[in-house]
Amino acid sequence: HGPGVSTEVIAEALEISQPAIFKRFGTKKDLMLAALLPPSVPAWVSALEDGPDERPIVEQLREVIRQAAAFFAETIPAMSVIRASGISKEELLASFEVAPPVVAKRTLIAWLLRSKEGGLIRPVDFEAAATMILGALQFRAFMVQIVGDAPSGAPDEDYVDDLADLLTHGLAPEVG
């Protein structure tokens, strides 16, 4: 139905009364945020705090990429609906102490630093690496949202493997 759907239609779909929606959420905006707002720390970001471990970095990157890709595949459409409903960026960010993308990037940078300390990757600009990873995942999810299909047409699992492989070679410790 999209962001313009009436609370009457929402209530009917949920098999509850319209007043029950307003009693619980107060406003349609609050309902939209409760239904669509991502968590302040998504599960994939929390998982970064436990790693990396001693497994090959390509395996660990695949896990990170797979989890983050699934998150962005859900979040990009939800954020589009939130923004299309007229909720401003400022209203959206007021829900968080620190903006979730900032938390995600900081946590990914810390994970990459620990990967370097463990000898799994070489020293690089970790902010650039984190931005590249996040950008590759967000852009793919955005393209699917906009055009309905991934830019390369490759299945998600192939994209995860290809991105992990590319990153592994780019981040590989220098030999010699």
Q: Model-predicted segments: where are they?
A:
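Helix-turn-helix
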Residues: 1-30, 34
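Conserved hydrophobic residue
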Residues: 4, 120-121
